[in-house]
């Protein structure tokens, strides 16, 4: 399992939200490119970028910043979500050097879009399953659909999706621990690799996920590495050690 640091972008800054609320933010740094460099230096194998403003608007708001990070660290794959609701946006990101695009809102409203995108750019499309009470949220988490996260995941079983990024919104940014059981339940339901997100805040969370018999593919860490409660290099090393022992 790989540990993936998150960089959330809002108004040009690197921020963290609590439970996805746009009015409850903490600004951690005004230079997202420098933040990316810090995590790469700590050993990150991949970076998770979220365009928060883009997620709400439905179109990219931090495209140039993301392109700059891709140029600065070409050997570190980026996965980017937030506002990717068209083929053109996805292709622009890939052409700029982004490794993976994450489709969330449109995956809920139009699953066929994901299937078509997977055919055009196989192995480069992830689906963001941002769940509130088990149901997928959309539009920057401002709306909650009637689609169960597990049901949507099963829909993409044969589509060629690179990974499912599962976030328990209730845990996100709250430092209360990851919902390991819900993540494992999703991983049991499908053969698509599952990446955990939301609430990963301690080495115990990392150990629980990395040691899951279902084989969780990754864990995204956010607020804990910014607050100093979790050292990224130690988390990466711990995940590797647990994986070696499995």
From Swiss-Prot:
GO terms classed as biological process: L-histidine biosynthetic process; L-tryptophan biosynthetic process
Pfam family for this entry, one: His_biosynth
Metabolic or biological pathway, per its Swiss-Prot or TrEMBL entry: Amino-acid biosynthesis; L-histidine biosynthesis; L-histidine from 5-phospho-alpha-D-ribose 1-diphosphate: step 4/9
Keyword tags: Amino-acid biosynthesis, Cytoplasm, Histidine biosynthesis, Isomerase
Any one annotated GO CC term: cytoplasm
Principal cellular location given in the protein's record: cytoplasm
Compartment(s): Cytoplasm
Protein family per UniProt: Belongs to the HisA/HisF family.
Protein name listed in UniProt: 1-(5-phosphoribosyl)-5-[(5-phosphoribosylamino)methylideneamino] imidazole-4-carboxamide isomerase
Organism: Halorhodospira halophila (strain DSM 244 / SL1)
Lineage, top ranks: Bacteria, Pseudomonadati, Pseudomonadota, Gammaproteobacteria, Chromatiales
Gene name of this polypeptide: hisA
């Amino acid at each position: 399992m790989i540990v993936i640091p998150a960089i959330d972008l809002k108004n040009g800054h690197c921020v963290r939200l609590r439970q996805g609320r746009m009015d409850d933010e903490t600004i951690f740094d005004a230079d997202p490119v420098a933040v990316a460099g810090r995590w790469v230096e700590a050993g990150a194998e991949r970076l998770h970028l979220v365009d928060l403003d883009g997620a709400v608007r439905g179109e990219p708001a931090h495209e140039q910043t993301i392109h700059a990070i891709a140029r600065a660290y070409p050997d570190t794959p980026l996965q980017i979500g937030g506002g990717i609701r068209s083929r053109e946006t996805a292709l622009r990101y890939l052409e700029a050097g982004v490794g993976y695009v994450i489709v969330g809102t449109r995956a809920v409203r139009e699953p066929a879009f994901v299937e078509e995108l997977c055919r055009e750019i196989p192995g480069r499309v992830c689906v963001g399953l941002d769940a509130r009470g088990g149901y997928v949220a959309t539009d920057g988490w401002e709306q909650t659909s009637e689609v169960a996260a597990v049901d949507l995941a099963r829909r993409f079983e044969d589509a060629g999706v690179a990974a499912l990024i599962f976030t328990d919104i209730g845990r996100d940014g709250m430092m209360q621990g990851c919902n390991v059981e819900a993540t494992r339940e999703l991983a049991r339901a499908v053969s698509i690799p599952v990446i955990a997100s939301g609430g990963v805040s301690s080495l115990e969370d990392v150990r629980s996920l990395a040691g899951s018999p279902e084989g969780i593919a990754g864990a995204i860490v956010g607020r804990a590495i910014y607050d100093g409660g979790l050292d990224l290099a130690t988390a990466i090393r711990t995940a590797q050690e647990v994986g070696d022992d499995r």
